């Protein structure tokens, strides 16, 4: 191989058209972190690269280092994909909108956390592991806890994981009213809320507190149906606030996720299944 060619293993997270026949693919790789590469002719039929460039396909890739391009999404050099050998796909992610949306959600998170030109094997492994769990989920109801679990583990990998098993300030137990602040590192007991006055802050329901407390485990200890979907929606929403605080970016898939788990209201419209009385706005302490 020449000095400009190299091999990586990567999972496709995003693709955008380029011209009439090509595609720019954003790939999370074990060896080089996040790379953006041109898949020439991949939108033509037939094409050796076509199906291999779809989202959530893991390939062994032969790459050519590109030259500087002012048209790329960032200031990275644009690479070129020469060959791709598929190692793994996730066909069952398309079994429902919830499965696919959860996968897209975690892909968005990985895109926010990944770094270019740096080996990020652990991020690659954690993302793939949680995509496999979501793909195996037997029902849409089972997807949401797995998504929330994956979100927490990605936050932990980036050093952003909030405190979810004790009060952030006093490290004491969580009894009575419990609150959550993304800026202040997670759960806060009521006495510390009064003393420290963190802001913004949200009240946490008892069921969401249980959901949050289960997340640091490598696998979810709770049966998938032991908590209402509202608890997992609430937990996901709180963790998403942490991600947004640290990255200053929103997760576009979150709105679609909420619609997947909407419950009918009296007028027949859907609304997110938050528990009765849960505040919809974050308040000052």
From Swiss-Prot:
One GO BP: double-strand break repair
Species this chain originates from: Synechococcus sp. (strain JA-2-3B'a(2-13)) (Cyanobacteria bacterium Yellowstone B-Prime)
Organism placement in taxonomy: Bacteria, Bacillati, Cyanobacteriota, Cyanophyceae, Synechococcales
InterPro entries according to UniProt: ARFGAP/RecO, DNA_rep/recomb_RecO_N, NA-bd_OB-fold, RecO, RecO_C
Keyword DNA repair on entry: yes
SUPFAM superfamilies: ArfGap/RecO-like zinc finger, Nucleic acid-binding proteins
Protein name stated in the entry: DNA repair protein RecO
Family: Belongs to the RecO family.
Biological role stated in the UniProt entry: Involved in DNA repair and RecF pathway recombination.
PANTHER family in the cross-refs: DNA REPAIR PROTEIN RECO
